[in-house]
Amino acid sequence: MVLSDVFISYSRKDSPFVETLNNSLVSGGKKVWIDWKDIPYSSKWWDEISQAIEGTSTFICILSPDYFESKTCNDELVIAEKLNKRIIPTLYKEFDPSSNSSNSISKINWVHFTAKDDFSKSFSTLIDTINKDLDWVRFHTRLLVRALEWSNKKNDSSYHLYGQDLQEAQSFQKNEAGKQPMLNTLQKNYIEASQSGAARLQRKQLRGFYIAALIYSIVQMVVIYIWSEQDLSETAMIKLSWVWLPALAFAIAGLTLGRHSIKRALIAMGVVMILFFLFFEMLWGYL
């Protein structure tokens, strides 16, 4: 999927103005996705349009009477609204307000590019709007693209966020208040599923670690008490318990605690070692 800074939605009848606007945006360093093809509707073509909207940070709609008469333009706008994209309505020609069925356009401040407006001033306003909270908007786009891919793959866990990507998503989500556009339901579900997946993976890795510690302690016990039994005194064997007992206590604690946690396993191991030490120091002399 191609990522872009701007997707321009427009009526073909407004192409001369759109070409001027596009050239100005490109000259300003913006990556613009725009469909110049005047071809009949097809599923392949519409998939390309849909993916371009999914992968853009800002959706600019060129408002005019012809825009609202175009089925394609209205369909593009519906997709942008559904994905919770940042939409910048750009007024090119005055139109009958009753022809606008979009609530999002009605609620957002427009950038005016009509014949009576100064293009340079309007363009400066447009650039400022595009650049507002740019890090947030780009994160929103990246997250949406990955969330859609995860959804299209039937929520396959191999498409989850992990490591630094998950930490970044959690950090951005924590600071979402006051940001536009807000995360949509799919994006939130994707972060939540990634968190759950990361927790499951961590538990699985910890179980493997604990099992390895358990095997180590058992091997040590076998070596000390079976292979070396004839060569060691009872006192020596008791003292050698410090070789295998910590690992055994750590492994059993880690595997049996309700939540797998290195910290909890270490605490449990410490408690066992203290109790054993007290037993050894206080009672061994009487046995």
What are these regions (language model features)?
Residues 277-287:
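Juxtamembrane boundary at the C-terminal end of a transmembrane helix
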Residues 95-107:
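Glycine-rich, charge-decorated loop segments at or immediately adjacent to ligand/cofactor-binding or catalytic sites
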Residues 1-65, 81-86, 95, 117-121, ...:
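Conserved N-terminal substructure of TIR/SEFIR domains
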Residues 220-254:
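Short alpha-helical packing/oligomerization segments
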Residues 98, 116-216:
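Long, domain-scale regions corresponding to catalytic signaling modules most often appended to membrane systems
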Residues 111-114:
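Short acidic-hydrophobic, aromatic-tinged amphipathic segments that line or gate anion-handling sites
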Residues 259-274:
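Interfacial loop-to-transmembrane junctions
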Residues 91-92:
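SF2 helicase/translocase ATPase core recognition
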